[in-house]
Amino acid sequence: MLIIETLPLLRQHIRRLRQEGKRVALVPTMGNLHDGHMKLVDEAKARADVVIVSIFVNPMQFDRPDDLVRYPRTLQEDCEKLNKRKVDYVFAPAVEEIYPQGLEGQTYVDVPGLSTMLEGASRPGHFRGVSTIVSKLFNLIQPDIACFGEKDFQQLALIRKMVADMSYDIEIVGVPIIRAKDGLALSSRNAYLTAEQRKIAPGLYNVMNSIAEKLIAGNRELQEIIAIAEQELNEKGFRADDIQIRDADTLQELTETSKRAVILAAAWLGQARLIDNQSVTLAQ
């Protein structure tokens, strides 16, 4: 496994891979890797000749400076895990390598609508930062496929739209959420949880299951369903942030013709803002 930190060296290897006709898969990450990331790597390995994992804590997508500062950086441990998985390349650039002129005045990629709705409304600039860095990685690495986790449901929808709108010839692969045995979705931010909070954390998944059961049963009183769910979360020790029930295919409000719903949930537990989602097939 080769660790690459500079753009010239990355471009050199990408040119060689292209000349050799290799099928390249990209797994973009911000590091602090867990089993969910390893599932992305496994999916990439099954679909390509060469796997490149990027590790870059992207300052452009953080809406709070304190969150950027305390985001876990575990490059050595991450590389050890990826080496065991027989990843071919790790691209781990410094911020100055990606944004040599700084963020002020940086050209960015913005996806209208999806960037500012739902999660984007509560985290201004977040999705603009995501689409910009992913676009830069696509331009640099020129992958044939790129793997993203379905845990970040809105982010995946945003990337798919960007790829379509910008005419990238890249297959976007969504990989299902990996959960702990108690149902908690694996996330780098779970590291913020205390031992006691970790015991409470699966409650978010349980509340989503309760919402799903009501939707499957035909209940469409969405405001009431959400209000009850928020109350349940608060009683469990969370601070409910945002719960939405949307059309899984459009992320717009549910209509009578919606075939699938997605439950999008975000809640604070101590210093950790946990997000999760669950898709439900609706009776027609």
Swiss-Prot record:
This protein's pathway: Cofactor biosynthesis; (R)-pantothenate biosynthesis; (R)-pantothenate from (R)-pantoate and beta-alanine: step 1/1
Class of the enzyme per the UniProt entry, highest EC level: ligase
Gene3D superfamilies the UniProt entry points to: HUPs (3.40.50.620), Pantoate-beta-alanine ligase, C-terminal domain (3.30.1300.10)
GO MF annotation terms: ATP binding; pantoate-beta-alanine ligase activity
Active site: 37 (proton donor)
GO cellular component, one term: cytosol
Keyword ATP-binding listed: yes
InterPro entries: Cyt_trans-like, Pantoate_ligase, Pantoate_ligase_C, Rossmann-like_a/b/a_fold
Binding site for (R)-pantoate: 61, 155
Keywords annotated in UniProt: ATP-binding, Cytoplasm, Ligase, Nucleotide-binding, Pantothenate biosynthesis
GO biological process: pantothenate biosynthetic process
EC number(s) given by UniProt: 6.3.2.1
Localization: Cytoplasm
SUPFAM superfamilies documented for this protein: Nucleotidylyl transferase
Enzymatic reactions: (R)-pantoate + beta-alanine + ATP = (R)-pantothenate + AMP + diphosphate + H(+)
Top-level taxon in the UniProt lineage: Bacteria
Binding-site list for beta-alanine: 61
Residues annotated for ATP binding in this entry: 30-37, 149-152, 178, 186-189
General remark: The reaction proceeds by a bi uni uni bi ping pong mechanism.
Assembly and interaction partners: Homodimer.
Function: Catalyzes the condensation of pantoate with beta-alanine in an ATP-dependent reaction via a pantoyl-adenylate intermediate.
Family as reported in the entry's similarity comment: Belongs to the pantothenate synthetase family.
Protein name as catalogued: Pantothenate synthetase
Species the sequence originates in: Salmonella dublin (strain CT_02021853)
Source lineage: Bacteria, Pseudomonadati, Pseudomonadota, Gammaproteobacteria, Enterobacterales
